[in-house]
Amino acid sequence: MKILADENMPYVQQLFGDLGTIETVNGRELTPEQVKDADVLLVRSVTKVDQALLAENNRLKFVGSATIGTDHIDLDYLASHNIPFSNAPGCNATAVGEFAFIAMLELAQRFNSPLKGKVVGIVGAGNTGTAVVKCLEAYGIEVLLNDPLLEQSGDPRDFVSLDTLIEKCDVISLHVPITKTGEHKTWYLFDEQRLNSLAENTWLVNCCRGEVIDNRALIKFKQQRDDVKVVLDVWEGEPNPMPELVPYVEFCTPHIAGYSLEGKARGTYILYQKLAEVLQISADKQMESLLPALWSERVLVQEISDERALLQLARFVYDLRDDDELFRKQFLNNQGFDHMRKNHTHRREFSALKVGNTGQTNVNWLSNLGFSGVEL
């Protein structure tokens, strides 16, 4: 059995190696010729899987995408050809949630404006949006949710309209899929008009899809409204963001919010489990055995007295400033955007760090934030 996998998917050899011959490829440049004799195709969001890509293949047994979204997959085509498909919903939700939370802490530090006491609006309350909520509520932050589709589906949580969210929130974090049609389309959800409606000193964080914000309109807006602070992990026109936008963004990264080692491993592992179901074989490997130990497995904490201390603890796991600096230096280089994504292999989730409490202050709330082994 031939397994064709994106070269940037981790742990493919360890998980799938016993099932067949593995060939890794550049997912953004995948061709029908490469795919024609594959039995299994494993991709990420950079690969569009449709009739054009699969036209020469008549033996495909499974397509897996190590992503939450499926907008790059022609699901109707796969179904019409009886090709089993699985994505990995929620695989990197924790990573995205922690990334957005860390970005807010970094903004708070840079502009001397504490996150504590702000109201945060989450646009899109699915897996990733909910993961942000978990971090924020663990820290005692008030959160408002906007997600008309979930609201209409009967989700029991409280929701507000987008206009209400914009009016009442100090911070807005975007976590929607990209949809181009329909009553609740998200393509250019934040267009010129909506950007201009943002309250003074709003923070806007986008970790979902670049086209949710009209990037050209954002440049014009930021030229007039420097009070609004912006964090972009995703960009219109990836992998070639508008160079003129970058100077107006407070923190820039190359679509890596979900790129923790845990999130990547989780995505590959979900596909391993799904393929085992399709092949009707036992999935006997364990994800935990794949992950390396953190450089420091345990940090002793006397107290978390302020946000500066919390941010310092978070930086033990991930320092956003490093990726921001690297992005500004490399994104204009040949294939710089994709090069940074491919080599983003160092980030961990809070759970990788054990926190020991040596003081009298209660820091047990850190376990709700995701840190492991919080001890008295």
UniProtKB/Swiss-Prot annotation:
Catalytic residues, chain numbering: R209, E238, H255
Catalysed reaction, written as an equation: 4-phospho-D-erythronate + NAD(+) = (R)-3-hydroxy-2-oxo-4-phosphooxybutanoate + NADH + H(+)
Protein name: Erythronate-4-phosphate dehydrogenase
Cellular-component GO terms for this entry: cytoplasm
Family as reported in the entry's similarity comment: Belongs to the D-isomer specific 2-hydroxyacid dehydrogenase family. PdxB subfamily.
Pfam family, one: 2-Hacid_dh_C
First-tier enzyme category under EC: oxidoreductase
Highest taxon above the source species: Bacteria
This protein's UniProt keywords: Cytoplasm, NAD, Oxidoreductase, Pyridoxine biosynthesis
Pathway(s) of this molecule: Cofactor biosynthesis; pyridoxine 5'-phosphate biosynthesis; pyridoxine 5'-phosphate from D-erythrose 4-phosphate: step 2/5
Family annotation (Gene3D superfamilies): 3.30.1370.170, NAD(P)-binding Rossmann-like Domain
Subunit description: Homodimer.
Cytoplasm in keyword set: yes
Entry's localization field: Cytoplasm
Gene Ontology molecular functions: 4-phosphoerythronate dehydrogenase activity; NAD binding; protein dimerization activity
Protein's job: Catalyzes the oxidation of erythronate-4-phosphate to 3-hydroxy-2-oxo-4-phosphonooxybutanoate.
GO BP annotation list: pyridoxine biosynthetic process
Sites where the protein binds substrate: S45, T67, Y259
Primary localisation category: cytoplasm
EC annotation from Swiss-Prot or TrEMBL: 1.1.1.290
Organism: Shewanella halifaxensis (strain HAW-EB4)
Residues at which NAD(+) binds: D147, D233, G258
